[in-house]
From Swiss-Prot:
Tissue: Endosperm.
Major location category of this protein: secreted
Post-translational modification summary for this protein: Five disulfide bonds, which are essential for the inhibitor activity, are probably present.
Localization annotation: Secreted
GO molecular function: alpha-amylase inhibitor activity; serine-type endopeptidase inhibitor activity
Alphabetical list of PANTHER family matching this protein: SEED ALLERGENIC PROTEIN RAG1, TRYPSIN/FACTOR XIIA INHIBITOR-RELATED
CDD domains with a match to the protein in the record: AAI_SS
Name recorded for this polypeptide: Alpha-amylase inhibitor BMAI-1
InterPro entries linked to this entry: Allergen/amylase_inhib_rice (IPR002411), Allergen/soft/tryp_amyl_inhib (IPR006106), Allergen/tryp_amyl_inhib_CS (IPR006105), Bifun_inhib/LTP/seed_sf (IPR036312), Bifunc_inhib/LTP/seed_store (IPR016140)
Glycosylation site list: 125
Function: Could be involved in insect defense mechanisms. Inhibits insect-type alpha-amylase.
Family: Belongs to the protease inhibitor I6 (cereal trypsin/alpha-amylase inhibitor) family.
Taxonomy, superkingdom: Eukaryota
């Protein structure tokens, strides 16, 4: 059988991740348990297995695997906002997010959650399980004291 599509004046798109927006492809406040996991990891704390399992369940619940990294990026941005860290060009403006947690460590912890959870993501940047956007961020420069 042959499929026939009739144009009725509407746009049709099959772009992966097209619906990956807060409230559409993932919750407006994504991954509450992953937030706790990232904060603990970033500060060098011991990973609580139940929190990690809950985080992994929340990631697995995202229906479109193309949305996972976008949702994690959204989570990262809202975590910085909650912690009072300003972003400039989507980069944190401080080197330390909270005592004992450096910006680049937090970014790496968030971007690596798919690998931690053995969750397939199709949009990696050469490293299995690590969100592509990690390579876009550069840690803030330390201001020299003169």
């Amino acid at each position: 059988p042959t499929s026939v599509a009739v144009d009725q004046g509407s746009m049709v798109s099959n772009s992966p991740g097209e619906w990956c927006w807060p409230g559409m492809g993932y919750p407006v406040y994504p991954f509450p348990r992953c937030r706790a996991l990232v904060k603990s990891q970033c500060a060098g704390g011991q990973v609580v297995e139940s929190i990690q399992k809950d985080c992994c369940r929340q990631i697995a619940a995202i229906g479109d695997e193309w949305c996972i990294c976008g949702a994690l990026g959204s989570m990262r941005g809202s975590m910085y906002k909650e912690l009072g860290v300003a972003l400039a060009d989507d980069k944190a403006t401080v080197a330390e997010v909270f005592p004992g947690c450096r910006t680049e460590v937090m970014d790496r912890a968030v971007a690596s959650l798919p690998a931690v959870c053995n969750q397939y993501i199709p949009n990696t940047n050469g490293t299995d399980g690590v969100c592509y956007w990690l390579s876009y961020y550069q840690p803030p420069r330390q201001m020299s004291s003169r």
